[in-house]
Amino acid sequence: MFHRPASVRRFVTTAVALGLLSTLSTGARAGARTHEPPPRPTTVSSTAGSTTALTGYAIQSTAKVTDPAAAVSSPGYPASGWYPAGARSTVLAALLAGGKYADPFYSTNQQKIPKADFQVPWWYRSDFTVADTSARTYLDFSGVISAADVFVNGRQIARSADVAGAYTRHELDVTSLVREGANTVAFRIQPNNPNKNLTMGWIDWLEPPPDQNMGIVRDVLVRRGGPVALRDAHVITRLDVPSLATADLTVKARARNDSDAAITATVSGSVGATSFRRSVALAAHETKTVTFTPADTPGLHLTSPRVWWPAGMGGQPLYALDLSASVSETVSDTVHESFGIRDVKAPLNSDGARQYSVNGRRLLIKGGGWSPDEFLRWDSTYVEDRLRYALDLGLNTIRLEGHIEPDEFFDLADRYGILTLPGWECCNKWEGNVNGSGSGDEWTAADYPVAKASMAAEAARLRDHPSVVSFLIGSDFAPDAKIEKTYLDALKAADWPTPVVAAASDKSSPVSGSSGMKMTGPYDWIPPNYWYAKREGGATGFNSETSAGPDIPTLDTLRRMMTPAELDTLWKNPGAKQYHRSPSSVFGTLKIYDAALAGRYGAPTGLTDYVRKAQLAQYENVRAQFEAYGRGATDASKPATGVIYWMFNSGWTSLHWQLLDRYLDQGGAYFGAKKANEPLHVQYSYDDRSVVVVNNRPAAVSGLTARVTLFNTDGTQKYDKSATGLSVAGDGAHSTALTLPSSVSGLSTTYLARLVLTDSAGKEVSRNVYWLSTRPDTLDWAHTDWYYTPTTSYADLKGLGSMARVPVSATASTTAGTDGASTTTVTVRNTGSGRTPSLFTDVHLVDSKGKPVLPVQWSDNEVSLWPGESATLTVTYRTADLHGSAPRVRVSGWNTAEQTVPAA
């Protein structure tokens, strides 16, 4: 048994999140590395209630360190030749930042990194200085992967058996060990194996990092305070629904006496203009929960509260809780916590599907599965850019299957009104007890306290974020009775406020019951008409993860991630193993996808032709997925209640499961989703040929006109019909405008459908162009597998290949704002003299060298224009991302020559 120093106390508290490195540099240069000096010591504040994050570490493999732990963890130890690491860093992230290895996102470079280097423990060593030792000092940390022995100033204060699990949070009282001046903390990090440890893995998302993310990926905090510590502060909100006229707040915190004597502390705080205080008598080393309610503090009963809403439904106001504990009128500790007031319900509907409502208003969950950086490097700007993309796409939700991000992520989600669905991951240790022959070791007695501490930690960290609307305690499988009780006990103790979901699949647990979700795929290619069937992955119920699989990025991105030889194989050999798709044998090739691409559009004639066909295919498929779920959201029978696109993004340079690529470039998948989810939208239904108007705005709309025109691929008009006086309610309601006939005389096998929606003033408010076939895709439902449904015959879209080339003119100008952002306005016009439209006209903002400027947000893109028609598009971006270059605009299209025009 390990004996700690008598005065070193360990408190297991709550979890911070997956912190990541502060740079996304991948270390593009290989070769000899010049060792840098260790990070400068962190200066720790002496202020009561302060928290100071360690600024970084010197790290080294234990295979190269022969000195004893007492020496390594003592001030003054010469860590010469060690590698510098950021405050949140895996081992490999630090080595990549130092240039030890070539860019792992390019080609197969990652295969060249030796895995054996990470199968031994690594030292993480950091120095900090303390000017005043009279205050109490604690180490507060989470995010250790997979486990660690912890030392301070030469003394071991925790063993890896105690500090285990990526999500557990630990608070160690080191008051007796710190000294004035230099101090040292050292972690001996154990290797990670997600099948054996309750940490995180990458499943079939991408090629797993050679170090399996071993390291410290959250901040290690040095906390200072007086004899009484405040912990676990939070606010329980009760909003009156549906009136939203009042809300009751309950403030709770634990006051802990860390001294050897009895103390009377004063706990005081405020929420807005309401203040409260109470004297609390504490025996030596006693902890009490202090609670303030409207019964004793009338100001905690709010009238006309500022209510938090998801984006598009209202604003995102936040409140602040400030607390302090004082002893003899001297501040001992302080707490600041933000929270929002909102109500979340998610009952099962009559079909057994989970139906979310926020503040009494039902909504269709439309989201994507989130991936962090493969090496868990944190960059707040990069994360914010992606969340802004989610809003641009009309999404309202992000699902986090494991890899639960740091506090800053949820702060951003709160601010932007993006709902989040965090939960545990599948296919490894987390589900080892319940997934039969699947991956992951079964749990031992030692795993249950780690799981409970993980749940308690995440619950305490996430509960006050209004963006968090559930926690999924299972993914592909629901927990068994013992594991579920472990989780639910922790959630109850944390006053968890939102629905707990047993699994992301159609599973049940003994207490939580049915999940109300489905995980029926698909994960690989299926045709657009698949989504309209109310079966399997089609638009009924809540599909927690689904897409048509591969999402080939733009040609610009492909050339950044693959060698010329690999790109040659990409379009020539559908059966070739694709390193940048998935390590899974099921998803290792593009065989299913490529067969469909050739069968529907014609065999590719080269890389450029392959990529342009891929963008068309991805646009129509992603659009259909979201349109089908959008149309089905208010169906009386078997309505659609939620859809999570699998995935929103990838953690590396990928060929599948992404609406946007690693570099934030946007292609067919992105703009297909953006089109489908626009606020007021006209769409075509692949199942019954109906033309439907979907209103995602809160308010009803009337006086609309929907017009549908069908064209042969040469531009010859074959059908035209309008429906006037249309009205549609808000909050996702839809109205059928008209239904197209089953056949139209003279219509070519491949044809185009142009849908235009105008308001009562005749202004165009939605435009949607489809490329369709009189020979639809035919699905073989009887042979459906878990990841796709085979297609026995493909829609014939080969006629697009014979479309005449048409000229498109483009003009552009740029205005720089005072906020560091610029806006470029582009007008594109089909100047052809015939009847042929310019199909799928894409506009990219580039610099003087032709490199895409990213990230960007376009008002619209990949537009189709008939002769004489024009479209004015705007794109906003950070001026600094031009890097001093003059902006230019590159215009290309399905049947339009590429050109680049100035945009200064």
From Swiss-Prot:
Protein name: Exo-beta-D-glucosaminidase
Ranges where the record places region Disordered: 28-49, 813-833
Nucleotide-binding keyword on record: no
Pfam families reported for this sequence: Glyco_hydro_2, Glyco_hydro_2_N2, Ig_GlcNase
Catalytic activity: Hydrolysis of chitosan or chitosan oligosaccharides to remove successive D-glucosamine residues from the non-reducing termini
UniProt-annotated location(s): Secreted
Gene Ontology CC annotation, any one: extracellular region
The enzyme's E.C. designation: 3.2.1.165
Active site: D476, E545
Biological function: Hydrolyzes chitosan and chitooligosaccharides with retention of anomeric configuration. Has no beta-mannosidase activity.
Single GO biological process annotation from the record: chitin catabolic process
The keyword rRNA processing appears for this protein: no
The protein's assembly and partners: Monomer.
Broad class of where this protein is predominantly found: secreted
Keywords for this protein: Carbohydrate metabolism, Chitin degradation, Glycosidase, Hydrolase, Polysaccharide degradation, Secreted, Signal
Species of provenance: Streptomyces avermitilis (strain ATCC 31267 / DSM 46492 / JCM 5070 / NBRC 14893 / NCIMB 12804 / NRRL 8165 / MA-4680)
Family recorded in the similarity comment: Belongs to the glycosyl hydrolase 2 family.
Reported pH dependence: Optimum pH is 5.3.
InterPro entries to which the protein is assigned, alphabetical: Beta-gal/glucu_dom_sf (IPR036156), Beta-mannosidase-like_N2 (IPR054593), EBDG/EBM (IPR043534), Galactose-bd-like_sf (IPR008979), Glyco_hydro_2_Ig-like (IPR006102), Glycoside_hydrolase_SF (IPR017853), Ig-like_fold (IPR013783), Ig_GlcNase (IPR041351)
GO terms of molecular function: exo-1,4-beta-D-glucosaminidase activity; hydrolase activity, hydrolyzing O-glycosyl compounds
Span of the signal peptide: 1-32
Bias (Low complexity): 813-828
